[in-house]
Amino acid sequence: MAITVGINGFGRIGRLVLRVALSRADIKVVAINDPFIAPEYAAYMFKYDSTHKAYKGEVSASGNKINIDGKEITVFQERDPVNIPWGKAGVDYVIESTGVFTTLEGAQKHIDAGAKKVVITAPSKDAPMFVVGVNEEKYTSDLNIVSNASCTTNCLAPLAKVVNDTFGIESGLMTTVHSMTATQKTVDGPSHKDWRGGRTASGNIIPSSTGAAKAVGKVIPELNGKLTGLAFRVPTVDVSVVDLTVNLKKETTYEEIKSVIKAASEGKLKGVLGYTEDAVVSSDFLGDERSSIFDASAGIQLTPSFVKLISWYDNEYGYSTRVVDLLQHVAKA
């Protein structure tokens, strides 16, 4: 029986989640809600993508629906989720991808509107967070609202888990060199809470805060309080990279670390954690479905217990793939 899905928020993640969902035989997206996007424009935005290129199938719009390869999807334009007729549309699961309704209280509106469960595509202050490949097995069916954490946490957590499980992490600092996102400015503009964040995205390297490293402690409790980090926003359109510098409890060699991560990428974490020794750059990972691709030739070691590890991620497509994976896991529980 198909998993019937509604998507709230048809931005970067919402549209890519739809692309991924359309490739899964057990998922049927029946409705989209976005108060700022009419059906005809939704069809256009889905079909044409400057980063991931045009959708190869047939896309059209008629009335309040869009049609993708013969599959009809109803488009709603409600500002308040409680007014979205999810129940009438037959939606059981909602992907909350507006970046607005990220708390239990906010996401509950979807359930009040007729949905059964909600997956939030952002970190949450109070909803339980799950990272596929790290802690999704802890999900229980009584949890109706869950968070897929952030794209950066999805990159960092699998790597941190493998390293911690084998060598133990005493403490660590993370830097993510992160591509531009929609919240940034095309030219200098007002940004009262984050002055640097108001500067031109395409012409600056912008230091920023991130809770991604601390969030790892929520999905890997034994690392709680042991990791923190920061971000640099850089003028690339997609694909980011994590720099994880850690003090290890157990002394080792960089070759042994590489071997352990490679084994994990070919075993339980295959499809989530990747491994490469090639001389790669960011654009080589556009469209990569994996959460984290360890760059074996980019890391360095200073002492037997102090190392810097580098891992790439498509912060749009890889993350959207994990959203759909988590949705499937929730539906099967």
From Swiss-Prot:
<protein>
    <recommendedName>
        <fullName>Glyceraldehyde-3-phosphate dehydrogenase</fullName>
        <ecNumber>1.2.1.12</ecNumber>
    </recommendedName>
</protein>
<feature type="binding site">
    <location>
        <position position="181"/>
    </location>
    <ligand>
        <name>D-glyceraldehyde 3-phosphate</name>
    </ligand>
</feature>
<dbReference type="GO" id="GO:0006006">
    <property type="term" value="P:glucose metabolic process"/>
</dbReference>
<feature type="binding site">
    <location>
        <position position="34"/>
    </location>
    <ligand>
        <name>NAD(+)</name>
    </ligand>
</feature>
<feature type="binding site">
    <location>
        <begin position="150"/>
        <end position="152"/>
    </location>
    <ligand>
        <name>D-glyceraldehyde 3-phosphate</name>
    </ligand>
</feature>
<comment type="pathway">
    <text>Carbohydrate degradation; glycolysis; pyruvate from D-glyceraldehyde 3-phosphate: step 1/5.</text>
</comment>
<feature type="binding site">
    <location>
        <position position="315"/>
    </location>
    <ligand>
        <name>NAD(+)</name>
    </ligand>
</feature>
<feature type="active site" description="Nucleophile">
    <location>
        <position position="151"/>
    </location>
</feature>
<keyword id="KW-0324">Glycolysis</keyword>
<dbReference type="Pfam" id="PF00044">
    <property type="entry name" value="Gp_dh_N"/>
</dbReference>
<keyword id="KW-0520">NAD</keyword>
<dbReference type="GO" id="GO:0004365">
    <property type="term" value="F:glyceraldehyde-3-phosphate dehydrogenase (NAD+) (phosphorylating) activity"/>
</dbReference>
<dbReference type="InterPro" id="IPR020830">
    <property type="entry name" value="GlycerAld_3-P_DH_AS"/>
</dbReference>
<dbReference type="GO" id="GO:0050661">
    <property type="term" value="F:NADP binding"/>
</dbReference>
<dbReference type="GO" id="GO:0051287">
    <property type="term" value="F:NAD binding"/>
</dbReference>
<feature type="site" description="Activates thiol group during catalysis">
    <location>
        <position position="178"/>
    </location>
</feature>
<dbReference type="Pfam" id="PF02800">
    <property type="entry name" value="Gp_dh_C"/>
</dbReference>
<feature type="binding site">
    <location>
        <begin position="12"/>
        <end position="13"/>
    </location>
    <ligand>
        <name>NAD(+)</name>
    </ligand>
</feature>
<keyword id="KW-0560">Oxidoreductase</keyword>
<feature type="binding site">
    <location>
        <position position="79"/>
    </location>
    <ligand>
        <name>NAD(+)</name>
    </ligand>
</feature>
<dbReference type="InterPro" id="IPR006424">
    <property type="entry name" value="Glyceraldehyde-3-P_DH_1"/>
</dbReference>
<dbReference type="GO" id="GO:0006096">
    <property type="term" value="P:glycolytic process"/>
</dbReference>
<comment type="subunit">
    <text>Homotetramer.</text>
</comment>
<dbReference type="InterPro" id="IPR036291">
    <property type="entry name" value="NAD(P)-bd_dom_sf"/>
</dbReference>
<dbReference type="InterPro" id="IPR020831">
    <property type="entry name" value="GlycerAld/Erythrose_P_DH"/>
</dbReference>
<keyword id="KW-0963">Cytoplasm</keyword>
<dbReference type="InterPro" id="IPR020829">
    <property type="entry name" value="GlycerAld_3-P_DH_cat"/>
</dbReference>
<dbReference type="InterPro" id="IPR020828">
    <property type="entry name" value="GlycerAld_3-P_DH_NAD(P)-bd"/>
</dbReference>
<comment type="similarity">
    <text>Belongs to the glyceraldehyde-3-phosphate dehydrogenase family.</text>
</comment>
<feature type="binding site">
    <location>
        <position position="233"/>
    </location>
    <ligand>
        <name>D-glyceraldehyde 3-phosphate</name>
    </ligand>
</feature>
<feature type="binding site">
    <location>
        <begin position="210"/>
        <end position="211"/>
    </location>
    <ligand>
        <name>D-glyceraldehyde 3-phosphate</name>
    </ligand>
</feature>
<dbReference type="GO" id="GO:0005829">
    <property type="term" value="C:cytosol"/>
</dbReference>
